[in-house]
UniProtKB/Swiss-Prot annotation:
It comes from Campylobacter hominis (strain ATCC BAA-381 / DSM 21671 / CCUG 45161 / LMG 19568 / NCTC 13146 / CH001A). InterPro entries: QueC, Rossmann-like_a/b/a_fold. ATP binds at I7, S8, G9, G10, M11, D12, S13, S14, T15, A16, A17. Its cofactor is Zn(2+). This is 7-cyano-7-deazaguanine synthase.
Amino acid sequence: MKAVCVISGGMDSSTAAFIAKEQGYEILALHFDYNQRTMKKERECFNLICDDLGVKSREILDVSFIAQIGANSLTDKNLTIQKTGVKSGEIPNTYVPFRNGIFLSVAAAFAEKEGADALFIGVVEEDSSGYPDCSENFIKKIESAINAGTSPNFKLEIKIPLVHLSKTQIVKKALEIGVPLEHTWSCYEREDKACGFCDSCRLRLKGFKGADTKDTIPYI
């Protein structure tokens, strides 16, 4: 069995990839560069996680056209990354329009070429920033569209093992299956030391606190 794993270098996608390995899949690792602020750090963490997994097949794809579309603070440095938390029902300016839809479409093409059985992505719906392309409903619908638009001899299952877990549950699961969380990066803003205040840092720290364990990556 082969699975394409979309790995950003973050905690969630890395844990999803380790789950794929635990389930016996041969991992085809896929990473996307889209000129985000922390692109170099994320790429570094992707390679570290691939080394930890013993992955031989790894691809880094340039989808920098996402930055040309803009409309988000991850790629547009003229926008300030929100650090005040996210209110219920609010979509923060760190939301990259249809990013996961783009990633999954490209990953599906790669999976079809490679004859993969599954595609793992670490989306989280329950304890997240509220991005619409991280919901189970969206994933199921794009899975249906992918299978309608690819070869009849190809059927892809998109696996989202973390979608209904809290950040605390994700940290606990990661520790249970041996994910080296010190090799992952979550900060939206910085590559040297995590800011500790962007929504992604807040959620990460919340998970570690709930799991009663220390996050060993550097913070300012």
